[in-house]
């Protein structure tokens, strides 16, 4: 078994590819059970965000694990192959460390990805697909991420996706305080966006969600008006800014709904930021003249602001990561010798028990205790040295020198050459 990580992210795949391999919260447990249940992998954890879908696993068949991803989403492997990255052993570990530290994010140094990785690990634990190897790797991953964030300035001056959405809205409207804002969804991303937008004091804020209770809870925090998704067709035209991020597998806002809203608004422009993957807004909506539609990838230029000033922190972070990759791979290597060490100790215990039993019998017969102890020690010595001595005598001339060096090293022998 070996560590293997594979997937797609904003570096390797466009949005229309990423949304086809995304996992919803509802499908995650089934996906994990399906992957491990087919015995393609021994352990697995899946991270699925707006910018990445990647799978970490412990497997002897990496290619079959990759094939599972395409099959699970009813895709042809050939269509997905050009966008995939596949990382084995230390490369998989380094990737995990970089992702958790925010070095692989669209928003350099962002902290949100660390929470998303922790949620992915929690899901794997709940599904029973997290074993010793992945558990140890992720624990080390979180340790490295903490060290990077506390020892470097990687997160300084970073612009989050939520902040970028607010900045973009200001560039379109100039002043958000004169606009009405509609949030669709009630998850972490919408919560972050609401904090940034509400700080600009918009005229009115509405929160729409499939579960009205969650919309109400978020509305209480931000003094907003809660509605259900079913009310969107009537409410959409009343808002100037729409920010959406749900876990819906299908679009929530279609071209027809936006056309009706624009007509009711008498063609006053409407600004929409869709941070969901899969997308909440149909791509055809971008064809409408009075709609300013931005998807998650469109925010890239804004979130890169301040990047140059943090290159020194990136170098520091990479040094920390490389050192910890070496430490973790050393732990992995030592784990491979555990069965041998255990077998060696078991054999030694058998020798001990055999000689101890023999000594007890001799003592019971009235034998001299000193002679019994000498016999016990002699018996143990002979048993412990029998195998290496036999191996040295039976080995071929070509291999003898190498074996002699190995025995000298194992037993720390010192004698004149």
Curated annotation (Swiss-Prot):
* Swiss-Prot/TrEMBL keywords: NADP, Oxidoreductase, Porphyrin biosynthesis
Q: Which InterPro entries match?
A: 4pyrrol_synth_GluRdtase, 4pyrrol_synth_GluRdtase_dimer, 4pyrrol_synth_GluRdtase_N, GluRdtase_CS, GluRdtase_dimer_dom_sf, GluRdtase_N_sf, NAD(P)-bd_dom_sf, Shikm_DH/Glu-tRNA_Rdtase
Q: What class of enzyme is it?
A: oxidoreductase
Keyword Lyase set for record: no
Q: Which reaction does it catalyse?
A: (S)-4-amino-5-oxopentanoate + tRNA(Glu) + NADP(+) = L-glutamyl-tRNA(Glu) + NADPH + H(+)
Q: Cite the annotated pathway.
A: Porphyrin-containing compound metabolism; protoporphyrin-IX biosynthesis; 5-aminolevulinate from L-glutamyl-tRNA(Glu): step 1/2
Q: Which residues bind substrate?
A: 49-52, 105, 110-112, 116
Q: What is known of its domains?
A: Possesses an unusual extended V-shaped dimeric structure with each monomer consisting of three distinct domains arranged along a curved 'spinal' alpha-helix. The N-terminal catalytic domain specifically recognizes the glutamate moiety of the substrate. The second domain is the NADPH-binding domain, and the third C-terminal domain is responsible for dimerization.
UniProt record similarity statement: Belongs to the glutamyl-tRNA reductase family.
The record's function comment reads: Catalyzes the NADPH-dependent reduction of glutamyl-tRNA(Glu) to glutamate 1-semialdehyde (GSA).
Q: What is this protein called?
A: Glutamyl-tRNA reductase
The record lists the organism as Nitrosomonas eutropha (strain DSM 101675 / C91 / Nm57)
The gene name on file is hemA
């Amino acid at each position: 078994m070996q560590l293997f990580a594979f997937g797609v992210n904003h570096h390797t795949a466009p949005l229309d590819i990423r949304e086809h391999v995304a996992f919803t919260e509802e499908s995650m447990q089934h996906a994990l059970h399906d992957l491990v249940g087919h015995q393609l992998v021994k352990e697995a954890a899946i991270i699925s965000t707006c910018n990445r879908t990647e799978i970490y696993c412990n497997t002897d068949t990496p290619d079959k694990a990759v094939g599972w991803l395409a099959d699970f989403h009813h895709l042809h492997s050939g269509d997905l192959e050009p966008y995939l990255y596949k990382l084995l052993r230390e490369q998989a570990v380094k990737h995990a460390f970089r992702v958790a530290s925010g070095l692989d994010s669209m928003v350099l140094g962002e902290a949100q990805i660390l929470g998303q990785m922790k949620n992915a690990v929690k899901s794997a634990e709940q599904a029973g697909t997290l074993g010793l190897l992945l558990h140890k790797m992720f624990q080390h991953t979180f340790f490295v991420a903490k060290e990077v964030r506390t020892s470097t300035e990687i997160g300084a001056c970073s612009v989050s996706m939520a902040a970028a959405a607010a900045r973009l809205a200001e560039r379109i409207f100039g002043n958000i305080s004169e606009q009405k804002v509609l949030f669709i969804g009630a998850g972490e991303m919408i919560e972050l966006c609401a904090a940034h937008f509400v700080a600009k004091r918009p005229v009115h804020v509405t929160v729409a969600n499939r579960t009205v209770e969650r919309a109400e809870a978020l509305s209480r925090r931000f003094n907003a008006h809660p509605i259900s998704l079913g009310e969107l067709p009537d409410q959409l035209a009343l808002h100037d800014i729409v920010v959406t991020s749900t876990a819906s597998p299908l679009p929530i806002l279609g071209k027809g709904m936006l056309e009706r809203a624009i007509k009711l608004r008498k063609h006053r422009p409407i600004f929409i930021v869709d941070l969901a993957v899969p997308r909440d807004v149909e791509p055809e909506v971008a064809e409408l003249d009075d709609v300013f539609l931005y998807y998650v990838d469109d925010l890239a230029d804004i979130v890169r602001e301040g990047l140059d000033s943090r290159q020194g922190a990136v170098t520091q972070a990479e040094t920390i990561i490389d050192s910890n990759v070496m430490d973790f791979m050393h732990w992995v290597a030592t784990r491979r010798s555990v069965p041998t060490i255990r077998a060696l100790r078991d054999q030694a215990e058998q020798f001990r028990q055999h000689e101890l039993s023999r000594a007890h019998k001799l003592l019971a017969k009235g034998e001299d205790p000193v002679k019994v102890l000498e016999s016990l020690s002699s018996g143990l010595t002979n048993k412990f040295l029998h195998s290496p001595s036999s191996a040295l005598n039976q080995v071929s001339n070509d291999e003898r020198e190498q074996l002699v060096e190995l025995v000298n090293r194992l037993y720390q022998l010192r004698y004149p050459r």
